């Protein structure tokens, strides 16, 4: 039952929150609203509804390139070697790896559709133009790169390069800008305060508006 997946449940709670706000069920002290929607996926257990897994046939998954002996020479940090010993997929077949990547991509698509529903609800309720939308992730995933899955305390691009999207139709900043600067999640709150005309960030993070 697709409705029992956490992605469906969390999306539904978000939609109900917005509908409740629009109906006026919030006191003046509770306005304007702040809604934090956190999807636990894509995490173990790797599962997604069939209509999503069907979108990503395992046999069509392209495996990430591998460097033979990556952790067998002196160029690899010891920490990375230990992580590979713990997490490396040394016994899985290529078909098994493709299947896991397939489900991971299906889970991401499932979340994408949930976010789409929430944005469409904002539009339907005439809330989108004056709502600041922030999309990001706490970390990436090896997902087959460097011969590993999930995550670890190392600084590979696949783990630390995550999206950060800030959108506000009524915002006084350039729209559609793509920036490759390195930033931190600690910068999100100062950015939101800046957008609302609040300038005291207490030196915790930086506003990203003028990057």
State each model region's role.
Residues 185, 189:
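Zinc-coordinating Cys/His ligand positions in small cysteine/histidine-rich zinc-finger domains
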Residues 1-10, 19-182, 195-202:
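Active-site-proximal cap/lid insertion segments
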Residues 16:
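Active-site periphery "cap/insert" segments of enzyme catalytic domains
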């Amino acid at each position: 039952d697709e409705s029992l997946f956490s992605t469906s449940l969390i999306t539904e709670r978000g939609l109900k929150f917005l509908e409740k706000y629009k109906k006026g069920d919030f006191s003046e002290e509770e306005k304007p609203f702040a809604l934090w929607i956190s999807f636990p996926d894509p995490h173990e257990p790797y599962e997604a509804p069939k209509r999503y897994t069907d979108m990503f046939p395992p046999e069509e998954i392209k495996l990430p390139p591998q460097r033979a002996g990556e952790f067998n020479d002196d160029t690899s940090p010891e920490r990375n070697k230990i992580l590979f010993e713990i997490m490396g997929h040394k016994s899985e077949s290529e078909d098994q790896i493709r299947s896991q990547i397939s489900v991971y991509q299906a889970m991401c698509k499932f979340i994408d559709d949930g976010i789409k529903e929430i944005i469409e609800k904002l539009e339907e309720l005439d809330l989108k133009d004056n709502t600041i939308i922030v999309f990001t992730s706490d970390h990436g995933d090896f997902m087959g790169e460097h011969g590993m899955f999930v995550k670890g305390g190392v600084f590979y691009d696949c783990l630390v390069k995550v999206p950060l999207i800030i959108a506000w139709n009524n915002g006084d900043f350039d729209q559609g800008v793509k920036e490759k600067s390195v930033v931190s999640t600690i910068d999100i709150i100062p950015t939101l305060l800046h957008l609302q005309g609040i300038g005291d960030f207490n030196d915790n993070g930086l506003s990203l508006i003028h990057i």
